[in-house]
Amino acid sequence: MNQHNSLDSSDITYKTEELLEATTNRYKITVQVANRAKRRKYEDVDIIDDPQVKPVIRAILEMVDEITQPEIISD
């Protein structure tokens, strides 16, 4: 999660576009991002990692990593 601390808005925009380009259904991925962000918000209510990184941005970054680096999940 430390890598997410140094992102600026252009990096976030790039990652969002990368996520949208990697999927065939933009609506479905948007709903998945929203659901993950909502779930993370309520699961991590006691844990304050970084108030600068909003749950939706964290969800986008995690999902891009999962899609572009499948070896993360397979381990």
From Swiss-Prot:
- Any GO BP annotation: DNA-templated transcription
State its location(s). Answer: Plastid, Chloroplast
Catalysed reaction equations from the record:
RNA(n) + a ribonucleoside 5'-triphosphate = RNA(n+1) + diphosphate
The entry's cellular-component GO terms read: chloroplast; DNA-directed RNA polymerase complex; mitochondrion
Q: Main localisation, per the record?
A: plastid
Which InterPro entries does this chain map to?
A: DNA-dir_RNA_pol_omega, Pol_omega/Rpo6/RPB6, RPB6/omega-like_sf
Transcription listed as a keyword:
yes
Task: Give the record's keywords alphabetically.
Answer: Chloroplast, DNA-directed RNA polymerase, Nucleotidyltransferase, Plastid, Transcription, Transferase
Q: Does the UniProt entry include the keyword Chloroplast?
A: yes
EC nos: 2.7.7.6
Enzyme superclass (EC): transferase
The terms under GO molecular function for this entry are: DNA binding; DNA-directed RNA polymerase activity
Q: What does this protein do?
A: May be involved in RNA polymerase activity.
Tell me its family: Belongs to the RNA polymerase subunit omega family.
Q: What is this protein called?
A: Putative DNA-directed RNA polymerase subunit omega
Instruction: Point out the gene that encodes the protein.
Output: rpoZ
